[in-house]
Amino acid sequence: DIPKDVTTARCEYAYPASVSMRSYNPVLKGHTGQIRKALALLMEAKRPMIYTGGGVVLGNASAELQQFVRALGYPCTNTLMGLGAYPATDPQFMGMLGMHGTYEANMAMQHCDVLLAVGARFDDRVIGNPKHFFQEERKIIHVDVDPSSISKRVRVDVPIVGDVKEVLAEMTRQLSALSQKPDAAALKAWWTQIELWRARDCLKYDRTSAIIK
């Protein structure tokens, strides 16, 4: 803490002749080889999940996210900070994730075998205890412009450092050129399970007018 009399005191400031500041030069384009590895994992997935956060909103990458998710046909969820990045009325949208999120989003997150995280932090409100969330058989792909955010809370199998808008666009381009397609039978079974979780209608409550709620 700094005493109030110090913060309100007036003084003469000697300006330096020059100022040298280390600038921040983020990597914008994702590594092509890493993107290729990520797509290979996504093609082999039996229970895929796409988990997006506020980085998609800040990166103005909603259009790129929608194009990529729809091309795959995989389920997608947003964190609180990522709401609005994907249309809430889209059938592939699972609702918000985390302690205040939907049952189906949280169950799919916990049971997926390949997880693509885009502009998200793996916050404790989303994954709970990292030790319990981590599973050897679950493969995690993490896209983020900040390299310090990758493998910060959970171990990541395929890190991709880059601007989410650029990376998602490149992933879509590479996806369209692939001869391999998602496992249709496995994906159908996965969506069947998701619909069972969704059928619980977790946000529903008794709307009787007898009691003010």
What name fits each language-model region?
Residues G98-S149:
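Phosphate/diphosphate-binding loops
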Residues T8-Y15, N60-E64, P87-Q92, V126-P130, ...:
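Short acidic, glycine/serine/threonine-rich loops at helix termini
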